[in-house]
């Protein structure tokens, strides 16, 4: 069965909209394969309470990785854990977001697995044994159609191109551990400073106006 993996981004213990978009995109792809979506979510203790929310957006299995050191994004721990899970699960595809975090994580995972990667994906289709995606090039002046036959295909969705869609599934919950100790990594987050309140993240804004 060609199951599909989705990486669910969190911030401050909450699931981000781009994370639910990744689950929705994975659900669309899995439906074409007649398979399941397995969603991985990292976070501090208590993040497991979000499993039901993630399941409602199409995840058949929600893999929870709780660790006090994962309150902030840890690139080494996230890369090792996601790559190990994708490899052991033999997924047909792994869906991320082309957010700031996803731009860092998805290429790391692809490099570790020696897998094909496409970022800023606009749409997903299945044709024969290929996953066919649309990807903007030349500052959006050209839209390329790319067919990926290798497994796993690492796909990072452009934010806001697929609206999160609930399908009222009740995903099974699986508890797991980081592939490496977050406290032993070479890069650790010492401090996080939040911007002024009331401002929407650009990656989640429905409309961006630039002059």
Where are the model-predicted features located?
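N-terminal glycine-rich FAD/FM-binding segment characteristic of electron-transfer flavoproteins
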Residues: 1-211
